[in-house]
UniProtKB/Swiss-Prot annotation:
A Pfam family that the UniProt record links to this protein: MMR_HSR1
Residues covered by the EngB-type G domain: 23-205
GO cellular component: cytosol
Name of this chain's protein: Probable GTP-binding protein EngB
Organism: Helicobacter pylori (strain P12)
Encoding gene, per UniProt annotation: engB
MF (Gene Ontology): GTP binding; metal ion binding
Length: 208
């Protein structure tokens, strides 16, 4: 079983020079405002590190967290950074600030070679939003051979059983499912342990 031995906040940045040095593999968490990024990060890491803004789209910083993962069964201990990007879709900012903000994020994703995994959170109740399609296309256009893109559906526990089953069968692969109530799900759906194992695999291996 994978245990998160340490998870702590590193820094926030709004410009590339403010980002911490790229000393370890990193995963990026992105998604629309109110998609549940903070809940996912806190559940994944077992600690309330990521904060939700009361105003959707208000947070315009990339937040960096250092995490240490341990898998005793396989004698593995590794450190990774988690990068929490601002939610997109609701930002009520001036055009000039929005352009500067998007420019920083695009540059961050383009040039930071330590990023190995992009995790795109999508609301399971709204699968065909244009903003999510555009985000997926833009990220996939950036991917290098040593990087991977993964969809992860949030709000899964808000669906009825038939909707859950259809999503599980029909969603484009690869994908994962997240809920803050993992234990309430049927055993046929991924558990928190499976989510952690999957992410660890992507962070440790070259997907090409």
């Amino acid at each position: 079983m994978i245990a998160i031995k340490d998870a702590h906040f590193l820094t926030s940045s709004s410009q590339l020079f403010q980002c911490p040095a790229s000393l370890t593999s990193e995963m990026v968490i992105l998604g629309r405002s109110n998609v549940g990024k903070s809940s996912f990060i806190n559940t994944l890491l077992g600690k309330n590190l990521a904060k939700s803004s009361a105003t959707p789209g208000k947070t315009r910083l990339a937040n960096f967290f250092s995490t240490t993962w341990e898998d005793k069964e396989n004698a593995l201990r590794a450190t990774f950074n988690v990068i929490d990007l601002p939610g997109f879709g609701y930002a009520k900012v001036s055009k000039s600030l929005k352009k500067e903000w998007e420019g920083f994020l695009w540059e961050l994703l383009s040039v930071r070679t330590s990023i190995k995994l992009f995790i795109h959170l999508v609301d399971a109740r709204h699968l065909d939003l244009e903003i999510d399609k555009n985000a997926k296309e833009n990220i996939q256009a950036l991917l290098r051979p040593d990087q991977a893109y993964l969809s992860l559906f949030t709000k899964f526990d808000k669906l009825n059983k038939n909707e859950q089953h259809r999503l599980f069968l029909n969603a484009p692969k690869p994908f994962l499912i997240n809920t803050t109530h993992f234990n309430a799900l049927s055993s046929k759906y991924p558990t928190l342990e499976i989510v952690r194992q999957t992410l660890l695999k992507y962070l440790l291996t070259n997907p090409s």
